């Protein structure tokens, strides 16, 4: 009854934050039980508001029929994005990455890049690192938000970016990634496909549990 009352007073994005915190603090089975008690459309709207990696974590424990049921109630872009991540093999970079990151083009000016950052910052899981891509969406560099803020608006991104950027492939094992992040003190790592296209990021928070196990 108390949970049902909470549902009525919180918006889907507020519930998404609450559910995400519960999943982090407690067993995901408890969160799945809470979702199951909700109206399916409301539960789907909560999953749609969550960061993709968190939504995938919860959905991956459900049976196929339940997954399809929730995805069918989301908008097409969101459901396809989650379905794509669900197809990656468990415990690989692809299965734990989030697609909510900020990327800019290397041929942009700092001024235009900052406009994009301001527009996308609210939905991004991490804004400290800004990843740079070429015209083929291949990862070519990285810079910090501070780099952008202190640079002149007319400076080109390719002049400012650090071209020595460490990345992992979608098929890399999560324990290998955790070791790299721990050894090099990274707070995030970009994930690329086999053509070096930037497809997601993995944050330090996502890897804490894995780091305790290695």
For every predicted segment, state its role.
Residues 1-214:
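Hydrophobic packing positions in regular secondary-structure scaffolds
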């Amino acid at each position: 009854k108390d949970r049902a009352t909470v549902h009525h007073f919180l918006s889907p994005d507020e519930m998404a934050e609450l559910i995400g915190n519960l999943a982090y603090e407690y067993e995901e089975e408890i969160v799945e039980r809470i979702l199951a008690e909700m109206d399916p459309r409301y539960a789907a709207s909560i999953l749609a508001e969550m960061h993709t990696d968190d939504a995938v974590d919860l959905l991956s424990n459900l049976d196929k029929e339940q997954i399809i049921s929730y995805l069918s109630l989301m908008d097409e872009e969101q459901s396809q994005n989650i379905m794509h991540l669900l197809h990656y093999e468990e415990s690989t970079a692809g299965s734990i990455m989030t697609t909510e990151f900020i990327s800019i083009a290397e041929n942009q000016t700092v001024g235009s890049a900052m406009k994009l950052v301001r527009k996308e910052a609210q939905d991004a899981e991490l804004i400290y690192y800004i990843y740079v891509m070429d015209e083929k969406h291949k990862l070519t560099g990285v810079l910090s938000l501070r780099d952008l803020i202190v640079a002149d608006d007319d400076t080109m991104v390719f002049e400012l970016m650090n071209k020595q950027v460490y990345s992992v492939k979608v098929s890399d094992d999560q324990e290998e990634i955790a070791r790299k992040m721990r050894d090099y003190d990274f707070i995030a790592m970009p994930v690329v496909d086999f053509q070096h296209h930037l497809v997601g990021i993995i944050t330090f928070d996502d890897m804490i549990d894995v780091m305790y196990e290695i």
